[in-house]
């Protein structure tokens, strides 16, 4: 229902204004030859996301999009209602290793779930890993966790700025200290423990 309302609101707003979209440069010099067939790729320059021109293009697109969406008259009402719907405590199922229980919890509006640990079901839980503190700007995401078979270590993977590449860290659960083991440039993988090590891809 909400997507239909949103689209209707956008359409109504669009009727009252003529929007000027930013121009996108076409580079007609970029042509690939595949076995005798020439294929033009005039927008390949946009694949280089580190240039000033690409950054300016993205900013122009963001500005025109925000201007369009800001004219939805009930946009704030939708935001308020959606916030109300997701603002509740959420828990994962706990996992147990050698009388330690690990689970994740979200208080409601946290960007990422926090990993908690308990040494017994009667003990007050404590924070083992809070991914919301991994970066100041929220661009580092926790993508997976894996507890060692002896319950001593937690391997976890993070992604930076939405990248498919992941980094693997290993934490000593008792001390909360990171081990020197730090693996970079892994992809689409977690850590699968075997004895005192783990496999990854």
Report residues per predicted region:
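Beta-propeller folds
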Residues: 4-201
